[in-house]
Amino acid sequence: MIAVVQRVDEASVSVETPAYEARIGRGLCVLLAVERGDGEAQAEWIAGKIARLRIFPDEQDKMNRSVRDIAGAVLLVSQFTLAGNCAKGNRPSFAGAAEPRIGEALYESVAQRLRTKHELCVETGVFGAKMKLSVVNNGPVTLIVQQRHKG
């Protein structure tokens, strides 16, 4: 599982058909790819990592607070292209991405864990849809968080 985590002042995602929009203020915009072989263990780990990452400043301007500490929100957007491999040729291979049925289930699992276990306000994109994403980065602070399955 791969997540690109961005500290944001605001972020939104929209889909034209069917009409859909989700928006957050201060918090994290997370682009998430589920890889072949991923399971609930990776969903649990990455949700915990997203919730606990201390990338927001404290009173001394040190990165010492999590999204939960600042009462921020998470915009979680599926992005299978993060699992793309560009090692050969010029067209990426997405063979490393989970099949859509599994990818969607684990994407939803991460969202649900963030909401229930970590008590965060979570907005989501639409799995598998072509989306437009608007992000106002803060910092910028962008991290790649990855949990590989064992085996």
What does each model-found stretch correspond to?
Residues 100:
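Active-site-adjacent loop/tail segments of enzyme domains
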Residues 1-93, 105-151:
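N-terminal, polar/charged subdomain of small-to-medium soluble alpha/beta proteins
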